[in-house]
Amino acid sequence: NLSGFGGPVHDSWFTERTELARKNQLIMRKLGMQPVLQGYSGMVPVDITDKDPSAQVIKQGTWCSFQRPSMLKTDSETFDKYAQLFYKVQKEVYGDVSDYYATDPFHEGGNTGGMSPTVIAEKVLANMMEADENGIWIIQSWQGNPSTALLQGLDAARDHALVLDLYAEKTPHWNETDPGSYGGAEGGGEFLNTPWVYCMLNNFGGRLGLHGHIENFVNGVAQAAAQADHMAGIGITPEASVNNPVLYDLFFETIWSDDGENLS
C-alpha cells in the first residue's frame, strides 16, 4: 500500500529478516505446510525511471496520505522482464519452498491507468506460471478487490488461483449476488467459480478484547460448506494473533460439523 516510511534501513536489517524468513519456512515445511511467498504484479519504486528510463509506469497515488509504489504497465515488455527477474531472484534467496504467491495490484485503492483489469490479471498469472508451472495466485477479497473484471482474467487457468474471503464472518463476498461485484451472480457467484477460502479476520491492529461474530461464522461456515461448489476450506486472517482463544478454537471446530455448532 505504501512505498516506504522513515528510514533508511541498515543492510543488516534485510539480512536478519531474510534469515528469519528462511527459518520460518523450514519449520512450516517440516509441518507439511507451504508458506505463501510474494507474487509480482508490477510494483516498482516511484523513481524507477531514474534507473530504467524504458520502464512504462502508472502512478498509483496515495494511500492514507502515504505514497503508493508505482506500477509497471502489464502489457509492456518491461513487465515481463521484471516479473521473471523477481521470481528468479526470490527462488535464489529462499529456494523452491512453495507454489503459493500472494499479490493484490489494487489493494485498498490503486489506479489502472486506463488498462483493463482483465488484461492485468492475465499477465500477472501468466508470468507467475511461467516461473512456476504449479503456481497458485493468492488473492484477497477485501473492499472492492477483486473486481469482476479482474476475475475474468483468470479464465485461462482458474484452478491456479485461490481467493481468500478475508472478512467472511462479517461481510462475506463468496455469495455476492451483484454481477458487478466479486464475480457475483444470482445465488452466489463464488468469485466466478474460483477456488476460495472462508476466512475469519476478527482482529485489527492487535487490539485486545473477547469479542467476535460467533453466530455469523458458526452458521456461515456450515452454509458455505453445504451450498458452495468451490470452497477449498477455512482460514484465519487476523492482523494479530495469540488473543481471544475461544473464538479461534470454535472457528476451527466449525468445519467438522455439518449443521454448525450449538451455541445454546
Locations of the language-model features?
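Catalytic-core regions of glycoside hydrolase
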Residues: 1-264
